[in-house]
Amino acid sequence: MQIKRLRIDKHLCLVDFDIRFATVSGGSSTILIGENGAGKSTMIECILNILMSFDSPAIEKQIDYSYSLEYEYAQKSISIIKSGHAYRITADDSAIEGSYRKVRSFAQKNSLFPQRVVAFYSGTNNKLFPNIKVVNTRYTCLCRDTLRNFLKSMNDDSERFIPNFPKRKYNYCEEGFTPVYLLSILCGQKSFEKSYLIKACHFDKVKYVDMVVNTNKVEQIFGRGRFEGDVPTGLYYLTDFIDYRFTDLLRRGFMYSSNGKSYFQITNIDSVNIDSIAILEFFEKLYSLFETRFEVTVTQGESNVKCSEMSEGQRQLIKILGMLGI
């Protein structure tokens, strides 16, 4: 997606805001330079909210300003104009105008937006994450439904359809997810991100991953009280479906269960020879579905360093490399 022009009418510091972007055929990046308070973050927030508004009526209701957005995507020239409550969308030679509901249906049928959006904000006044969290609530619900449909297909001989997980469209790195990016990069295949991170931070490899799973969330998928004892057999059953290659690692890394949580210390993830994308997607499912929390310890020379104890600069680098590279 290449944005060509953005016009915003009277939103916070963006008053009669109109900016044209210099684009290069075949793809290009845009750098925003400006003084503090010039509206750089507000502009990025507006672009993100415009994209999310076509996935979430709740976010659309928050946009109380008129705007015009012109961009190129999938070899199409697209224009979206919002004036009050009226919309007009043009995609090459096709055009539609009317209410939000009408144009939203048109946009979804014609694939006018990217399938993956990555957002990153390193400042203190983070206005991006709350709305991304709202949109991703539906993603988490769809993942839970996928697990329940899987269980239904296993328990009903007439069900022959094995469901697939949806793809996460809006990606934003919460602080608690930084360790997952770290282990995905270091335990995955050879890549630019892996080489750069090792060289820049002098990391050697992942020594182990401490993981805590909320087993109450696991039992909610099955129905409470289905599994008894300390061993999280219900979790293993679900991870076999999510990605069976990780289940044995979890079994060997299991330590104990207490007060509705199961504790693991996982080693030798890189020995399984799984690529970074598969590692990320597996642990992201555990993070989103079962409130799993992680601590990754890496070797750095003769020392061991936890992800939570790394410098702010190292953690920001891990986020950027993970979100853009995997």
What kind of region is each of these model predictions?
Residues 18-19, 45-48, 82-85, 130-134, ...:
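Short coil/turn segments at secondary-structure boundaries
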Residues 1-3, 26-27, 37-38, 63-65, ...:
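Short, well-ordered loop/turn elements at secondary-structure boundaries
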Residues 90-229:
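Electropositive, glycine-dotted interaction segments
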Residues 9, 20-22, 70-72, 81-83, ...:
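A structural detector for beta-sheet-dominated domains
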Residues 24, 180-326:
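Extended helical coiled-coil dimerization/tether regions that scaffold
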Residues 2-45, 326:
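Pre-Walker A-like glycine/lysine-rich segment at the N-terminus of P-loop NTPase domains
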Residues 11-14, 24-27, 37-38, 51, ...:
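Short, solvent-exposed loop/turn segments at secondary-structure junctions
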Residues 44-102:
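Conserved P-loop NTP-binding catalytic core
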